[in-house]
């Protein structure tokens, strides 16, 4: 990582979360070529759990072949890849294999979809026991399948996994992370990180960056002003840098910001599905404000959520049927045209900015979590004062 990395989170526009069952390598190849043309370095993509591991002791061979073909196309376009495993939570839905469900645990905040239908059950305790052993089996299998593949930057253990289930303790979360990271490294000779998100800092979900990231070469974080109650606006340019610095303070690791972005407003609207949004020009200005802040303050890189809007024909299917704002986060519109945010990333890529030094800690982890919920807005207010001009 000699320079600040730029990337995009990726599901194809035509299939979204159905990519592995409606697989179109030609579409993926075209998208990767366009990413490379914009100067992006990394594509973060997602392995829908039930598509890859239909049973706890079985991995789908055809899915593995498709996975390797995606890695090969990334490498052909000189992109690095961050494959995200055990997905898991995505766009307001928990997509889960039937064998992971706990019939004594009902789904709560997020819908569970398993086998293409909504289930009333939530996931069992995947941080330990049989479910952890099944994940370790998958990690060893896929690691061996892609051992030392030149495209892989790092494995990602999961996307905002505390949205699936909160661990019983920070120690349990750290054990889960350490076991999977170990298995992935032993089988693939490639390190792993994990998709933490702003809610892991906004409430006590029994996740501590200091322990869960101990085995990672660097931490990753996701954050959105539109989903952050302490933000001053939907385009507050300090929210993402603040979450980055807070994660670095607690983990004592370098941090890559692997998700930031904004839902795009329909014409003439200021809300979409009741959530704040930005128009195209505002979204581009937001990216132009955040990218240099992250780079100057020592982040390893920044990935936009997400590469493309989805085909409007998917609007009646999950997750978009209940979360229509998720249709329009893209660097590209559904017709393939570029939004201003794509140009913002391309311009930043041409500057080839180097990595800056990581900043000193801005808060103490133990004091911060003990002081929640008040500590978050308090620390953010001090952070804004320090970076006011």
What do these predicted regions represent?
Residues 294, 302, 345:
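Hydrophobic, well-ordered secondary-structure elements that form the walls
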């Amino acid at each position: 990582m000699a320079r600040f990395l730029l990337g995009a989170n990726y599901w194809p526009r035509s299939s979204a979360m159905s990519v592995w069952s409606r697989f179109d390598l030609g579409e993926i190849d075209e998208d990767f070529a366009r990413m490379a043309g914009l100067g992006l370095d990394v594509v973060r993509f997602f392995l829908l759990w039930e598509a890859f591991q239909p049973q706890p002791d079985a991995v789908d061979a055809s899915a593995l072949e498709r996975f390797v073909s995606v890695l090969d196309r990334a490498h052909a376009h000189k992109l690095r890849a961050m494959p995200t495993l055990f997905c898991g939570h995505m766009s307001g839905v928990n997509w889960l294999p039937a064998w992971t469900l706990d019939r004594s645990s009902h789904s709560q905040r997020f819908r569970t979809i398993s086998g293409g239908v909504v289930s009333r059950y939530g996931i069992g305790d995947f941080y330990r026991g049989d479910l952890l052993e099944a994940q370790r089996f998958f990690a060893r299998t896929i690691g061996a399948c892609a051992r030392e593949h030149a495209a892989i930057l790092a494995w990602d253990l999961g996307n905002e996994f505390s949205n699936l289930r909160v661990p019983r303790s920070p120690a349990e979360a750290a054990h889960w992370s350490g076991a999977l990271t170990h298995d992935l490294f032993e089988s693939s000779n490639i390190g792993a990180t994990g998709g933490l998100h702003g809610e892991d800092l906004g409430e006590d979900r029994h996740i501590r960056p200091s322990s869960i990231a101990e085995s990672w070469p660097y931490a990753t974080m996701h954050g959105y002003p539109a989903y952050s109650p302490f933000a001053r606006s939907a385009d507050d340019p300090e929210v993402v840098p603040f979450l980055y610095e807070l994660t670095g303070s607690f983990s004592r690791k370098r941090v890559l910001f692997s998700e930031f972005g904004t839902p795009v407003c329909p014409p003439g609207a200021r809300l979409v599905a009741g959530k704040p949004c930005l128009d195209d020009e505002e979204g581009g200005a937001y990216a132009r404000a955040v990218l240099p802040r992250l780079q100057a303050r020592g982040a390893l890189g920044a990935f936009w959520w997400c590469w493309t809007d989805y085909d409007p024909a998917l609007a009646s299917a999950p997750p978009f049927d209940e979360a229509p704002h998720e249709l329009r986060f893209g660097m590209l519109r559904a017709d393939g045209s570029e939004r201003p945010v794509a140009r913002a990333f391309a311009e930043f890529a041409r500057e080839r900015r180097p990595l800056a030094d990581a900043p000193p800690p801005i808060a103490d982890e133990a004091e911060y979590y003990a002081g929640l919920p008040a500590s978050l807005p308090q620390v953010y207010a001090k952070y804004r004062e320090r970076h006011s001009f």
